[in-house]
Amino acid sequence: MTAPFVDPLAIMLIGLAMGTGIGAFYFFYAARGQKDQIASLVYPAIGIGLFDFMSGFYMSFAWPMKTFGVPYNMLFGDPLLMFGLLLIIGAVMIYKNVKLGIMPLLSVLLGIYVLDGAYSISALKLETGQNYITAMGLYIFDAIGAILVPIAYFKPEERKSGAIKYMYYVEWIILGIGTIFALVIGYLALYGHLSSPP
């Protein structure tokens, strides 16, 4: 007898949380001028970025959750795919020490997509109750975090406090809150799947 298939959403959410957590600590370390700590994020970012990209690709194109009645392939799979890709690109750019170019602007475009997803969740009533609150928290904080990535064009001055440094800390907090929402949803999904498999 084979075990019933349970969708991979739980681990995808944990992968998303790991990715946004890496992004959050990039801004934290950058605000403090800790270049060695930023360099230490490169390999985890590439690894988690690959996982998020492949997970998003699988959800977007194989669509393992047809019975849910909600288009999670567009709502979650597509932005996860693009997030993983941007995480890899960002890590390679840091590793190669090249200028940011348009990369932060690509993050803004993804943030707008995620913000549109948040609006759709509410307007189309795709989630209800506790799921609505956590989903909206995840989408809104991740969208704002993605839209604020262009602050990376401005470098905080070492050993000085200023608006740019504070903005880096604000971005760290926003991405950190998004990370917590992803972890909460992922851990609750794991428990739910284990307690009532299909």
Which residue ranges define each predicted feature?
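Transmembrane alpha-helical segments of multi-pass membrane proteins
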Residues: 39-51, 80, 104-116, 168-178
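Terminal transmembrane helical module of multi-pass membrane proteins
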Residues: 121-198
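Membrane-proximal helix-loop-helix units in multi-pass membrane proteins
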Residues: 70-144
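A cross-kingdom feature marking solvent-exposed beta-strand/loop segments within repeated
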Residues: 61-76, 162
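Hydrophobic alpha-helical transmembrane segments and adjacent interfacial helices
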Residues: 21-28, 49-65, 86-94, 111-125, ...
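N-terminal topogenic module of multi-pass integral membrane proteins
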Residues: 1-61, 191-198
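Membrane-interface helix-boundary motifs at transmembrane edges
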Residues: 29-43, 95-103, 155-167
